[in-house]
């Protein structure tokens, strides 16, 4: 009863998602909860399903995700990245379409740190010449 399993790790902002793909019906489970329950925003659920839409594999794999860190948007991006990487293991021919859609590229943008003497990362108090 050993089924083929495909794994991928995705990252976005401060979120890290470990993704497992198992041939199945298309059910997505995030941290042992259904995806509709875990991620309340419909637009973020669309983000998660992008790799399946690009490769026309929607509904053919069950997805099991363990995600930590970040907020809803960062976690959704990390899950998307992990699913795209796992789909590469399913079929290496998916690389071209996933790369063209920008799903394999790690989005390296992070929150810039606050600097001392400034109000935020770049916001300074108003400058007075005299």
Swiss-Prot record:
It comes from the Bacteria. One of its GO terms (cellular component) is cytosolic small ribosomal subunit. One of its GO terms (molecular function) is RNA binding. Keywords: Ribonucleoprotein, Ribosomal protein. SUPFAM superfamilies: Ribosomal protein S5 domain 2-like (SSF54211). The keyword Ribosomal protein applies. GO terms for biological process: translation. Residues 107-130 are annotated as: Disordered. It holds the Pfam family Ribosomal_S9. Residues 111-130 have a biased composition (Basic residues). InterPro entries: Ribosomal_Su5_D2-typ_SF, Ribosomal_uS9, Ribosomal_uS9_bac/plastid, Ribosomal_uS9_CS, Ribsml_uS5_D2-typ_fold_subgr. Belongs to the universal ribosomal protein uS9 family. HAMAP family: Ribosomal_uS9_B (MF_00532_B). This is Small ribosomal subunit protein uS9. It comes from Streptococcus sanguinis (strain SK36). The lineage of its organism: Bacteria, Bacillati, Bacillota, Bacilli, Lactobacillales.
